[in-house]
Amino acid sequence: MKPDQVLLQYFHNLVDMDKALSYVHKDAAFIAAFEKESDRHHFYGTYYGIEGVRTLLSKFQKDLYTQEFEINKVLADETTALAWGRFKHRIQHTGKIFESYWAVVCDVEDGKIKYFRGFEDTGALEAAFLID
């Protein structure tokens, strides 16, 4: 499977965590906005391996109610895929909307995502989690 197909299958299967994780390399590194953990937001940091990505996806499932997720374009070569689009999530504990354009770069090895880095409006993310 080509890198763009792997990334698309990962995205399409996010509703079933185990299926999505079947596209994650055992030595994966997934970066959620920033490499290092931060007190600015509990999503931030680098998540390693399948269990690390499971931890990240569990955080998303607990906190985000996806209302819209659009993929505008995916580009790829033999080992890398780039994608961008937009999403809208309702934050479970605040009820606020987090809406952003997003971009992802990933490297694929042996048909699985080995490196994944996501980019989004982190200011909007942090604001949506603030309790008024």
Enumerate the language-model features and the residues they cover.
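Short acidic-aromatic low-complexity motifs
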Residues: M1-I31
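Generic alpha-helical secondary-structure signal
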Residues: Q9, Y23, T55-L56, A128
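Short, flexible active-site loop motifs that bind/organize anionic cofactors or intermediates
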Residues: Q9-Y10, F43, Y115
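A solvent-exposed, acidic/Ser-Thr-rich amphipathic alpha-helical stretch
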Residues: K26-K73
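A beta-strand edge to alpha-helix "cap/lid" segment located at domain peripheries
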Residues: Q61-D132
